[in-house]
Regions:
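Substrate-binding cleft of extracellular glycoside hydrolase catalytic domains
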Residues: 1-115, 138
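Ordered hydrophobic segments in well-structured contexts
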Residues: 3, 22-24, 53-55, 88, ...
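Alpha-helix C-terminal capping segments
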Residues: 15-19, 77-81, 135, 162, ...
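Short, surface-exposed polybasic-aromatic patches that bind anionic ligands, especially phosphate groups
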Residues: 210-291
Length: 291
């Protein structure tokens, strides 16, 4: 899924004209800042059927508070969005090295809502600060890394390597995004999941968005991985629609980690001979995407 994140800098952006599967909106900062365009953008995104996230910027300049103070301020101002949007801590302010502060904020929001927020920062901070406490808390990671940061449209790059976090939920890969319908730069993001996965992060119960738990494994529509063994070994991933050959061991680790994080169990795994694979392809009219 491709999406954008916006703040008051994009006030008035018409989301009906900008292509995006999701939009993440700055809601609050510190103990006193409220984005004046947040609710307008939120309501438009909701009416358009977009997936939504809302974030709090920690230690907004001049409005710094304790984790509990800022958490309470955030929740007070987004109470109408709970259950409709992913809740997020943007951690890149003056206290960006204070992992205990971040963990306390995330824990506070989780305790008050029963929903685990995402944690946002950038790779240079993540990989030079010990955020293992946040990772062990099972908070989803939204990570930023821009590289050369040249003007570009959507792409779906692999996530950067991150210390402690086995799974990247969302990757912000440029702040120089250019999309139709908006005359200016936008932050562009890729979410490594589908709409059902997004809804799980929002906090919707799994029985609201997926079939009953007693459904048996269906190799025609359910996610699974399989290994072909004959001479050399090849690993493939089926995402419910398309079969992909994996070219990098880190891809397999990412898929397994994401599936376990969302579903609370290991992704189904099969071992096939090439002959069995050919039968499957012919029976269900599947065409693999080879590396």
């Amino acid at each position: 899924m491709n999406g954008i994140d916006i703040s008051s800098y994009q006030t008035g952006i018409d989301l009906s004209k900008v292509p995006c599967d999701f939009v993440i909106i700055k809601a609050t900062g510190g103990t006193g800042y409220v984005n004046p365009d947040c609710d307008r953008a939120f309501q438009q995104a909701l009416s358009l059927g977009k997936k939504i996230g809302v974030y709090h910027f920690a230690h907004e300049k001049g409005l710094e508070g304790t984790p509990e103070q800022e958490g309470a301020f955030f929740l007070k101002n987004i109470k109408g969005y709970i259950g409709k949007a992913i809740l997020i801590l943007d951690f890149e302010g003056s206290n960006q090295k204070d992992s205990a502060w971040a963990k306390a904020f995330l824990d506070y929001v989780y305790k008050q809502t029963g929903i685990k927020p995402w944690f946002y920062t950038y790779t240079a901070n993540l990989n030079t600060t010990d955020f293992s406490n946040v990772a062990k808390g099972d908070y989803g990671l939204w990570i930023a890394e821009y590289g050369r940061n040249l003007p570009q449209g959507y792409s779906q790059p692999s996530p950067p390597r991150t210390n402690n976090f086995p799974v990247v939920a969302c990757f912000q890969y440029t702040s120089s995004g250019r999309l139709s319908g908006y005359n200016g730069n936008l932050d562009l993001n890729v979410f490594y999941g589908d709409q059902k996965t997004w809804d799980l992060y929002v906090g919707k119960k799994s029985d609201q968005i997926v079939p009953p738990e007693n459904k048996i494994f269906d190799a025609t529509s359910d996610e699974f991985i399989f290994t072909l063994t004959k001479g050399s070994t090849s690993v493939f991933y089926f995402d419910g629609k398309t079969i992909f050959e994996l070219s990098d061991p880190t891809q397999l680790d990412h898929i397994r980690g994401t599936y376990n994080h969302i579903h609370g169990k290991e992704i189904p795994s099969l071992v096939w001979t090439p002959e069995q694979f050919d039968i499957y392809l012919k029976m269900y009219d599947k065409k693999p995407v080879y590396k």
